[in-house]
Amino acid sequence: MAKLYFKYGAMGSSKSAQALMTKFNYEEKDRKVWLIKPSIDTRDGSDTVYSRIGLSAKAQVISPQDDIYEMFGEKCRDADVVISDESQFFTEDQIDQLRRIVDECDIPVLCFGLRTDFLTKVFPGSRRLFEVADSITEIKTICRCGRKATVNARIGEDGQVVTSGSQVLLGGNDRYEAMCHRLPVSKNFKMYKMNSRNRGITAANAILRISCFIFRTVIAIFVQYYGIFDENRKKTDFLFCL
């Protein structure tokens, strides 16, 4: 029985790469794939799905006025699977049309996309997918601080995190960065830099402690085997207080 799948993740989590690899796997088994993308995504060419690792493939472009179910019947009725990239930009009606392909044609549909915008608001298309998808999977990635990234932060020309503006503003690594919820709180990267500095201090303390431990160990060996300060052990006690 076919299912509607939604695989979501923050920017840079390999969503497009996984979509293209899934397409390759189906085609390697002589299966016909209908790859689609919304017309609003024109970053890498209007009819191309592109991944940061260099993979790319031509796709059927879907405009907001298109009925995906009707297009499927007209253009690709013999497809074995439908794969959608940037699915968050589809309308709620178009998500229902993908659901209809699954139910009436018994064809699996795999949707890849973002969950939320730069203000952590759910995209309408993604919201509908959460409501009607049979299988929902998170594609995980990390923030620059090492925590799990869930926020698609929009970066302004001044390098600060933007907190207002239109929901849709196309861009790649120059405009967006996947972050955890903590990093963009101060609206800039000072918090991360501060944390990095603190981690550096912690590392320095660790190195100092290790050095003191080695020094104490060496002195202890000399004391044990060569009898240094044996007559007055208190002279070496201070070494063990470092």
Give residue ranges: language-model regions.
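Conserved P-loop
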Residues: 1-71, 117-128, 141, 170-196
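A short acidic, amphipathic alpha-helical/loop segment
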Residues: 22, 93-101, 125
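Walker B catalytic acidic pair
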Residues: 86
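Residues immediately C-terminal
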Residues: 89-90
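Sensor-1/coupling segment of RecA-like P-loop NTPase cores
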Residues: 102-125
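Phosphate-binding/switch region of NTP-binding enzymes
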Residues: 124-175, 186-188
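N-terminal amphipathic/hydrophobic targeting modules at extreme N-termini
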Residues: 197-212, 217-222, 231-234, 239-240
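Low-complexity, intrinsically disordered or signal/transmembrane-proximal segments
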Residues: 224-226
